[in-house]
Regions:
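N-terminal accessory beta-strand-rich subdomains and adjacent acidic, glycine-rich linkers
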Residues: 10-173, 180, 531-533, 548-550, ...
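Active-site-proximal substrate-binding groove within the catalytic cores of carbohydrate-active enzymes
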Residues: 145-147, 151, 369-585
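Glycine-rich, aromatic-flanked loop segments that form ligand/cofactor-binding clefts
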Residues: 165-181, 222-226, 250-301, 383-387, ...
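Active-site-adjacent "subsite" loops/lids of carbohydrate-active enzymes
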Residues: 184, 191, 198-202, 268-327
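Active-site groove signature of glycoside hydrolases
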Residues: 220-230, 317-351
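Aromatic- and acidic-residue-enriched carbohydrate-binding clefts of CAZyme catalytic domains
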Residues: 230-255, 282-308, 340-367
């Protein structure tokens, strides 16, 4: 590739723009600086509409007190070499932001791109020859429809600030630069819910769901999601029977009456759809032949991916969702597998000269589909709930949904904690949900509560078969549901700061004007408390019967166990204190 632009300074570092076709495309670069934040705008133009060229922006910076790479895609937090450091983003996968941090929660460099729709490749890793972090940000490396003009911005933030602030501000910069309008979530998006996935998998039925909801409602859960299985009599997993989206009459003989019974318990009702899926055994499969992006017939797939560039594909899907809301009186939908919409190699539309497609660019078609879905469902139910799953969690996705759930991590409290914390940093005001909680019924309630405490700074989804679990587990769940409700403003809407990404967040905190809540998850971690201005709560998610607190003042603390029952009190001296605290219990410091 040929260098198009003269070198631009990033401090003492050269920034270069490289383009595949500099003879037919002109690139103009503009730079603005505000303190330690630099912005670059790259404007491409061509005399006639043409497939845009692949181009990239490269630069490097010295590795100075930078030790860990932060992205939304990986939980590998070490310093990668520059020969194995690729991440990427597009509308329905990840987001165009990468950062490097030090060991003390400080930002060292955070780079974000304004391209929230198309594929963006990020390579950022250490060059071993000279200990420099080498960057390459690539655009138009996937098939793209012809155009004659394009612009994109790059933001390079090298401020010495809390890393979470750099990531949050980089995210909101993308929102502004791309002209995005995230939805405002209704209150129900923050309500704890029951998910039928881990507890039932596909083996769902009206009577069993109603019995579970009766238990869930008594404990304080307000929303239900019925996942895969409602649309088929088959229990063999995979997605061969998706696409028709007709209710299984064996499982749910009268869906509207069933939903009414769940509503009577005080719970809202949502169901799952695999958005682009047309199962190979679906009745409608032949109807849409020639309108698929790709087909997979493996054990865990068995479907073709619909191409939303066809208007009849979009209308088919939207009409299904509208019908479900109207006929069954649903309150929302879990719209899954949007990240499957993409190319597996070449774009099939190119060889067909885009025949039948009213939109040529795939990201534009996904955007159109999801905007129309949200607008038309909202017209039926203004407070409609729409859940999306990590990794389609970028700023553009927030325009179409109001619940962002951590990617599947059954039984993995560490991954759930890290994923929800990362989502809190990038999701703005959108409701962040934990992956569904499950644990063995023979687990001690104090040990089971660690799953709850690890996700306390998100909206929690439970997915255990409540009817078969001990009463002690239900008492524990009920208490923490009440705690999360009583402290929701601080936990979910207050200032949130997760600490030490390199250790998967051994402690996190959130606060509002009235209170501060600290969760500690690794034994031996010292957490600061300062109850002079407001009450502090310290939640013991370590699995050990002690916590270490560094108190700004002498104070008195109530000790409570995992059921919320008083377990004594303790006097804290100013400075370091070793406090005996029940596993999954908590301190209330005043």
């Amino acid at each position: 590739m040929l260098s198009l632009a003269a070198a631009l300074a990033v401090d003492a570092v050269e920034l270069k723009v490289n383009c595949e076709r500099p003879d037919s495309w002109k690139i103009v670069t503009e730079k603005s600086v505000s303190g330690d934040v630099e912005e670059y705008e790259f404007r491409l133009s061509s005399p006639t509409a043409a497939v845009p060229p692949r181009f990239d922006v490269t630069f490097d910076v010295p590795q100075l007190d930078a030790h860990h790479k932060w992205t939304t895609q990986t939980e590998k937090v070490t310093m990668p070499p520059n020969w194995s450091c690729h991440t990427s983003s597009r509308l329905c996968a990840s987001m165009p932001l990468v950062a490097f941090l030090n060991d003390n929660d400080r930002n060292r460099i955070c780079v974000s791109a304004s391209e929230a729709m198309r594929f963006v490749g990020f390579e950022a890793g250490l060059r071993e020859e000279d200990c420099r972090i080498v960057w390459k940000v690539t655009f138009f490396s996937e098939p793209e429809a012809p155009l004659s003009a394009y612009s994109v911005k790059l933001r390079i933030d090298r401020r010495d600030v809390f890393f979470g602030d750099a990531i949050r501000e980089g995210t909101e910069w993308i929102v502004r630069s791309a002209g995005l309008r995230p939805t405002v979530p209704p209150p129900a998006a923050f309500e704890p819910l029951y998910s039928a996935w881990y507890s039932f998998h596909q083996d769902v039925s009206d009577k069993a769901i109603e019995a579970e909801c009766a238990e869930a409602a008594k404990l304080g859960m307000k929303v239900l999601i019925v996942d895969d299985g409602w649309q088929t009599d088959d229990n063999n997993r995979g997605y061969a029977y998706t696409g028709d989206w007709e209710m299984s009459k064996r499982r749910f003989p009268d869906m509207a009456a069933h939903v009414k019974k769940v509503h009577a318990l005080g719970m809202k009702y949502m169901i799952w759809y695999g958005v682009p899926m047309m199962g190979l055994k679906a009745k409608n499969y032949e109807r849409f032949k020639g309108k698929y992006l790709w087909t997979s017939n493996s054990r865990w797939s068995g479907y073709s991916c619909l191409d939303p560039r066809f208007p009849e594909v979009r209308e088919y899907l939207i009409s299904l969702y509208e019908k479900a809301l109207r006929e069954w009186d649903l309150d929302g939908l879990k719209l899954d597998f949007i990240d499957a919409i993409g190319f597996h190699g070449t774009d099939p539309a190119i060889g067909e000269n885009y025949a039948g497609r009213d939109l040529k660019a795939l990201p534009a078609a996904v955007d159109r589909l999801m905007k129309d879905v949200f607008a038309r469902l909202k017209a039926i139910k203004p407070d409609v709930l729409i859940e999306f799953r990590q990794g389609y969690i970028g700023p553009a996705i927030r325009q179409y949904g109001n619940m962002m759930r951590a990617a599947d991590c059954p039984g993995d409290l560490l991954a759930n904690r890290a994923r929800t914390a990362n989502l809190r940093l990038t999701s703005g005001g959108t409701a962040v949900h934990a992956d569904m909680l499950e644990w063995h019924r023979d687990e001690r309630p104090e040990a089971a509560a660690r799953y709850v405490l690890s996700t306390m700074f998100s909206t929690i989804q439970y997915s255990v078969m409540l009817r078969t679990y001990p009463e002690s587990h239900k008492r524990m769940i009920a208490h923490w549901l009440k705690f999360s409700r009583d402290h929701r403003d601080a936990l979910l809407h207050g200032s949130f700061r997760p600490h030490h990404y390199e250790a998967f967040y051994p402690w996190m905190e959130a606060e509002n004007a009235a209170e501060r809540i600290v969760g500690v998850y690794v034994g031996g971690t010292v957490v600061p408390v300062d109850a002079a201005a407001k009450p502090n709560y310290v939640l013991n998610g370590t699995g050990e019967g002690v916590v270490f607190v560094d108190s700004a003042t002498a104070a008195t603390a109530e000790v409570l166990d995992t059921f919320g029952a008083p377990a004594g009190s303790v006097s804290l001296a100013k400075g370091l204190n070793k406090v005996v605290l029940p596993v999954s219990g908590y301190l209330k410091v005043r």
